[in-house]
Amino acid sequence: MPRAVGLETLAEAVRWIRKRRLPVAFPFEYRVVAADDIWMSPMNAGPVASISMHQYERMPWQALFAEAEQLFRAAGGRPHWAKRHTLTRADVDALYPMAERFRAVRRRVDPTGKFLNGHLRELFS
């Protein structure tokens, strides 16, 4: 999300977690990251604030992650590609202006889709 709204967004997340008494097993990570020029990087709109939430695998995570994603997206955030998220192909197109060019390169260097799983196939085929 834009750096200017990062701390307030983190504070809002802490407020709703406390209000709903959601179980949290790990500390959140808050980082300020400079902009980059990588087509599909969440940081290419930078400078950005990055808030990472993790949950122990045996603890419920669905409510925590769903609310966090909604809050972070409303603040202009984009999820890390290696984390759980609910982006659709249309979301990717709206959030990443170079998405179709990325898909074209992906198809050229991996024509059989060897490096795609089911979710990535939906987003990048």
Q: Model-predicted segments: where are they?
A:
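Substrate-recognition/cap regions that form aromatic- and gly/pro-loop-enriched pockets
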Residues: 1-94
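Activity-critical C-terminal alpha-helical subdomain
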Residues: 77-125
